[in-house]
């Protein structure tokens, strides 16, 4: 079996829903990433075997194929778009690594893209031309059967109650996320994973959801979204627009090209959980992954866990017995935002640029009651 390495991973800055990137379709969000990749590795672009992208709320079609053509990649390169809800971007990278392992190709571009601002409205199709009722709009697709398909907020509250996560702890974690992201933007760390955009003549190079001066006191003053709840707009992620991609290739090829460092793909797990507790997906995914690789949680020195809600991150940390110092060391999606399919690629880009680790995991809870997790090992020649 061949070995797969991630040698490059970047993302755009993330825009707020209805914010600075609201006018950009998914293909336009991906364009600067493809351009940066072509400039960095021009010698491999004609050797790409496939482009694998996640996308959840787009307008259909094959975003991967359309975006690679719009970016000027060779028309002989195919594209495939995957949908595993918000885990789609991470799943696309896992898919590409496995394709390299089984010798189905040597070079893949994988990641995800999402424009919540440009997502089309969906309405129920009338069964007859004589129907007189007003159009019924769908806020989102159903993830599970009726009675097992809570809203994201309800699911986050379910997790908070089931795992005894307090409002105070959720707010403290949210403040930590904003504080860490602001710190690592200011010292230049996070800039290494970002390809800036030019929007209406102005440079857009920082996540729009970030609130660098957010304090615990301000978070404590926010009202819960649900009556008697603990989840607020402050201790949850926002809806966002953005993209992220990675370049994955066979290790032997990377060595022959003189590439000096990257991340070696070790293994990945995707599993299901109770849909009413969907945010807890990282717990069984990471547990199964460690068991398969005969590792302990103490062997993992960096974990990037998508921050959809403070409640599910804290529940996952507690259940996995993680040290907080290993988790989201530069902050996470509560501060940077969560553009669904792009988030998994962002976790991988963060791991690639994060220093001082040997084994690292990227993991996500997924709509419909799932979780995925991927294990990388730092690789240097």
From Swiss-Prot:
Pfam families referenced in this protein's UniProt entry, alphabetically: Thiolase_C, Thiolase_N
EC number: 2.3.1.-
UniProt keyword terms in alphabetical order: Acyltransferase, Transferase
GO biological process: fatty acid beta-oxidation; phenylacetate catabolic process
InterPro entries to which the protein is assigned, alphabetical: Thiolase (IPR002155), Thiolase-like (IPR016039), Thiolase-like_sf_Thiolase (IPR050215), Thiolase_C (IPR020617), Thiolase_CS (IPR020613), Thiolase_N (IPR020616)
GO molecular function terms listed in the Swiss-Prot or TrEMBL record: acetyl-CoA C-acyltransferase activity
Gene Ontology annotations for the cellular component aspect, listed alphabetically: cytoplasm
Residues the record marks as active site: 86 (acyl-thioester intermediate), 338 (proton acceptor)
Family: Belongs to the thiolase-like superfamily. Thiolase family.
Name of the protein in question: Putative acetyl-CoA C-acetyltransferase VraB
Organism: Staphylococcus haemolyticus (strain JCSC1435)
Gene: vraB
